[in-house]
Structures are given as structure tokens and as C-alpha cells.
Amino acid sequence: SYNGDYFYRKPRIDYALLNKYSSGVICLSACLGGVYAGCYWANREEGEEAVLQCMREVTERMVSILGDRWYGELQWNGVPEQHELNQYIIKIAKETGIKLVSTCDSHYPTPVAWTDRELYKRLGWLGRGKPEWLDMNLPTSVQELEYELYPKNGDQMWESYIKYSKEAGVDYDDDLVLQSIEESHRIAFDRIERFYPDDTVRLPDFVVPAGYTADDYLRRIASESLFSMLKQND
């Protein structure tokens, strides 16, 4: 349920809430927007030791909450910074003893859903200008994207590792990466209950009052909310 105290751009939890309800929870360090990545982005200009020290502090905190249910997450894509982050995570894992997993950063349940969404999202920028970070050379096919954000099996994960590590020119320990892929399998099959991604579209069912069309009522509540927020900011 919604709680305004746990909302920052999207629903979230803080460390206190995680600590309170951590029993049985398995956490990974996430993608280039994750907690280890935060250390990387904030400290990379200061050098390797600054990044690692921040990651040590994060690791100590997460392990104190989750124990062996905290994992360093490696990902395989064409983003150069991902491979820099991977190297830092591997170093922290060797130093602290946390286990590693390899993932696809699965934002979408199927390749088809990913394909449709990624192309729609990027080509959509053409009609309304682009943010500064977006390359002028917008992709026209999924082959031009630098990642595949959907679940893969073990063989596909290994193929992604080989492909993207070669493109990045980064030498990894094959045995270590293989173990991280196998660890993902162990979590999926041995540590959690079975579930299957549900890609059905779910839209909220809004009751439109009598005398309004859906568009009219949306316009009304949007206007009322805007004026309410403006008053709060006075």
C-alpha cells in the first residue's frame, strides 16, 4: 500500500525498513543505478580506493542486515561503465567473501516485451527532442542497443558474457564468471519458490462520475491537484 514516507520518484524502502523485514529477503547489488554503482559514480574521479572504500561500507551494512543473502551483481552488456563496475564488484567480493551472481537486469519478462518497449522509448524521443545524455544516433533496431533486459538461461548468459567482455576488451576470470552464473541458477531453483513472469497488461479501473467523460474527469482532477500543489509551495 502507498505510504508517502516511502516514495521518492517511485516506491522505495529505507535501510530501517529493510532491516525490520529482512527475514528471507535475498538482495543483489543491482545495475548501474544500484547501491554499488552509486559508490562508483560518486567517487570514480577520486580514484579506485575511494570507490572501494565506499563499497566496503555498503557491503558491511548490507551483510549486517542480510548475511549471506547479499550478493554482488555482475551484468553483461555493451556499456563501458558496466565493465568498470564489474571489476570493482569482483574486487569487493574477493576482499569480503560475498558471493557473486550474473544477471540480465531483467526489466521485461520476455524478449518481445523488451524489443517493443526499447524501440518505442528511444524512437519516441525523435518527436519531442532528446535529453542531453541520449546519443544523436538513435537505434532503429534492437541489434543496435547495448543490452538485453530480459531473462536468459545459463547458456545465453555465458554467450552474453563472451560477447560483451570481448567487445569491451576486458579480461575476466572465466571460472569466476561461470560460478556467478551457476549461483544465479542456485538462487532461482534452490532458494526461492517457483514463480513465472506474468506479462499481462494491468491497467487501473477508475470510476468516472456521472456527467463526465474520462478525459474531462482526468482534466479536472489534474487541474485540482496542480492548484493544490501550487498552494502548498507558496
Locate each region found by the language model:
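Phosphodiester-processing cores and adjacent nucleic acid-binding clamps
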Residues: 1-234
